[in-house]
């Protein structure tokens, strides 16, 4: 029994143990049913539990197939709640199994105790020699219960141990039958002996005892038969239990093989996953190395681009300074040019003033000449009137004959009308009679024709009965009015802006005006001479009354200077003939044509001079307008330049202010650092433990290793006996930016050089040993914007302080001890 219970406990619990407990519990109290046999396994599924297979009726034994594992731990390994539930369920099943095993153990002990009591009650010595299986069988028969699974397991185990001798269980049952027969024989013999001993007793008593013995014997025989039947049933149950155990063993063996196959499969999958993991790690490492190389390449490219950008910025700064200096020089030159031009403009203004004064004097002279001519004209007109009256009185009212002098008068009137061309020509009506003209001609004076405010109206008012031609008077008044307007404009005109002395346009305009003025004067003189010659030439050819107009047209009028007069001659050839009466034409001037400087010629010359003066003034106005336009454009250009210079000045002021603030801030930082250094002067060289070594046979690597540094374990430094190489991050001198540089400490060249990269092709700087004064740790954190202040150290030279950042603390210590061996500028120890 102990072996059976132990074998049951050592067997691994099946996942379907909770499902098979119910039929097991039922089998402990009830008898074995006929259906509960091996023949009921016909349609059993190989994936069902062995207890379910025992309930089925089938005679054939199939190859065991692994059962389906439900609620396996491999299915719920990802869910923590399911794992906790699985653990709790398994614990409850184990507790329930332990409780059932305890109950079975108590029941078996009870059965054994009953068997022992029964054996003692029988008193047969042979019964004590029966094996425990017989006692258990008898106890089971008395208890009337089905043997438990533990007992069946014990019987199966004992049966398996006796299979080597063959038929052990059959011998057990035979010995049990023999013991039963012996018991019966003993009972019979004991009964017979008791009968023989009590034969002498009374018959009634004997009969009663015989009956009692017979009844008891009948009961014993009945019990014996029952026990035999029970023994046979138990034998069948034992055989069935053996078959069930064998089948369960086969099922467990199949399940074990299936689990082993799954285990091998999972083992192979795990090996494959391990190989994949190794390959993945290798690929990741390769990718990481590739990315590191790419990053290093990009970093180098970025450093190169940044250096180029800094160079461009410095170059742009220099170009801006040069441009600023050029602008300042240009500004100075422009200021000098402006001063020169102002001087030239002052000179031109003075010249223009002189020209205006000369023009005013010339106009005044011409006005005086005109007044004198008008006075002479008035005198001649008065003479003419007197002559007409005398001729009229002498001839009895007959007019003067029309002679060449009358034609000259007509020509002079025509010329005066042409000189007054800005005013429209009007046809005059016939003048009043000579009687009326003689009465009003004496009233005409120089003041009336000269400078009256409204000379035309006054002349017409006073000339109502005069014989003076009205068109001629209007022409003279128009000339005087234009002269007065020109003088008023000159007086009212504000002083023009002076032309630039170096402006070629203004100078050219003035020269052109002067040249045109001279040409106009020459043309006026030539025309006056030509007209005078033409008039005197026409007087030498007398003509009849009928042929005079044609002679007038071809001999005199074709000498007019412009085609406009010729074109208008067809329409207005005799416009001025109506200014006088027919008798006045015949009795016109008799002595006027004999003078070389007639009043009409003088008035014509004065009209030409006034036109030229007006033209000159117009050209002066145009020159002033051109000068104003040029000055405005020049002023705009100067304003743009001034704005650009002002913007540049403001920008420079801002830069200077920022520079001053930065200088002040740096000065404060320097003062603070000096104060801290004065307080901590003892820590000026915290890690420089060695003095510079100038020996030729000095081994740098041995020296560093003897100092306690792990050179071989530090991958950031490449150290040999004479040279030390590695990357350091250095702060720039002018531009405070941090750059990664490849440093080379060479004891043969006695220099500390740094390059762009480890190829050592582009040298960025050299520090000679004689210039290195100190090497110390930056304990004051004075490096601006250091990438790693904890790994920053300083290399002090004669003219500069280098800030460097090492990639690791060990590399920083190695570099400091390496560089200090070449600090030959540190001469304080010699004192």
From Swiss-Prot:
Disordered, as annotated region: 1-73, 160-209, 416-465, 584-603
Name under which the protein is recorded: Pleckstrin homology-like domain family B member 1
Domain remark from Swiss-Prot or TrEMBL: The PH domain mediates the binding to phosphoinositides.
PTM annotation (Omega-N-methylarginine): residues: 6
UniProt xrefs under InterPro entries: PH-like_dom_sf, PH-like_domain, PH_domain, PHLDB1/2/3_PH
Sequence ranges of Basic residues compositional bias: 1-11
Ranges where the PH domain occurs: 721-824
Comp. bias (Basic and acidic residues): 174-188
Positions of post-translational Phosphoserine modification: 12, 14, 27, 33, 45, 49, 57, 72, 77, 175, 421, 467
Gene Ontology terms describing biological process: positive regulation of basement membrane assembly involved in embryonic body morphogenesis; regulation of epithelial to mesenchymal transition; regulation of gastrulation; regulation of microtubule cytoskeleton organization
Gene that encodes the chain: Phldb1
Provenance organism: Rattus norvegicus
Presence of keyword Isomerase: no
Coiled coil: 180-306, 610-676
